[in-house]
Swiss-Prot record:
Organism the protein comes from: Frankia alni (strain DSM 45986 / CECT 9034 / ACN14a)
Residues the record lists as binding [4Fe-4S] cluster 2: 157, 161, 164
A GO MF label: metal ion binding
Keyword field: 4Fe-4S, Cytoplasm, Iron, Iron-sulfur, Metal-binding, S-adenosyl-L-methionine, Transferase, tRNA processing
Domain (MTTase N-terminal): residue spans on this chain: 4-120
Family: Belongs to the methylthiotransferase family. MiaB subfamily.
SUPFAM superfamilies: Radical SAM enzymes (SSF102114)
Keyword Nucleus: no
Chain ranges passing through the membrane: none
Cofactor: [4Fe-4S] cluster
Cofactor binding description: Binds 2 [4Fe-4S] clusters. One cluster is coordinated with 3 cysteines and an exchangeable S-adenosyl-L-methionine.
Record's protein name: tRNA-2-methylthio-N(6)-dimethylallyladenosine synthase
Amino acid sequence: MTGRSYEVRTFGCQMNVHDSERLSGLLESAGYVPAPPGSEADVVVFNTCAVRENADNRLYGNLGQLVPVKKGHPGMQIAVGGCLAQKDRSTILDRAPWVDVVFGTHNLHRLPVLLERARHNAAAELEIAEALEVFPSSLPTRRASHHSAWVSISVGCDNTCTFCIVPSLRGRERDRRPGDVLAEVEALVGEGALEITLLGQNVNSYGRSLGDPGAFAKLLLACGRVDGLERVRFTSPHPRDFTDDVIEAMAATPNVCHQLHMPLQSGSDDVLRRMRRSYRRDRFLGIVERVRAAMPDAAITTDIIVGFPGETEADFADTLDVVRQARFAGAFTFQYSPRPGTPAATMDGQIDRTTVAERYARLVALQDEVSWAQNRELVGRRVELLVAEGEGRKDDATGRLSGRARDGRLVHFRAGAGLAARPGDVVETVVTRAAPHHLTADGPLLSHRRTRAGDAWELARTAPVPAAGDGAGTTAARQTVALGMPSVGPAPSPGRR
């Protein structure tokens, strides 16, 4: 059956966002079309997270809201995949028997088949693979952005952090070969992408399974030789594996952005030991110091967990001290919550929620102070922005557009006269005001470069929305799908789109 509409709802990390692009690509390659905004999709797919607090409550709350919708929508199907599906398996069908398909992290490619089988048999399909069956980068992908793209360099994780369930759900780390990664990068740039983010659970352990511990630095240098690629980012590195050759490659490669997201998790050596993080605060601060020595303008962000079991007030004070010393541009901060199946969930010294919330508030207040101080130093500075879509929640009300500076900071700016800047275009402007989490530029644009990515965004916006069951619409929708990673041959030229 083709021509049915679909919607993918994503919870969790960048890995899930990229996996959802693949799920969309698989569905469109099988003949499904994106559901128009505001409509009820024939197929709703949940790509779930098992790391965030209350991840299961969020899923089952959303599933519960679909019960009356499904009753009034004959033939509607609901699928649940991702990390929570890999973990909970049949529990999902026990708690939500109206779900039609449950699939895991290792068998994304099976979704269209499972949906059709469930429809044909009028019975739920549960299929969880224990190991990766098909490397995800070979799957069709419907990119969410014309100008910026994720490129996976590895899947899985070999670390054993006591708070994290990801390795048991994503499997052991497996690296793609550098030539395959670069082929995908070149193909994306050939299609108009300006920015690539290299993605992995631990990007700077890349190459270990290939017998080349310096492979990640070499990959950054190779990305610097890709014509037309303007920005390269990566996420996330592990401080244990962060080596000086990566810093040297970042500093020496013009299109590698001076931005580093490196998870701290805690500033206390005792807590880091219980977390099994394999580094200590002095090593972390040493990396920060060397990065800033090589790239004084680098924006460094981090992840921090508050209230890990056994964390004392002195441990928490150590974390605040590292925040002051490291001067993070921003931080993703989390209140620890026990995740079933992790060693930390059964550790002694679980901290009461009131104490955790109080420490969390102090951490956020300090980080906002640090971020705001850094951002105020940028007022009056000229910045180059890659115009984004959906980054500014108040853009419509304020008459502004939003974009990302090369260091990753979010900047809201005035659109200016003449041809409007579009997502994917590149503009230059001057920062006029600072806030803890963004910058504002209310002056005139100093330059505006229209790009092929902006052209593609404009074309997609003006194209008619395909209707479910409309064969022509289905074909139009499928033109946005890249059919996997090219194995050989050059990237397509701009004229061969």
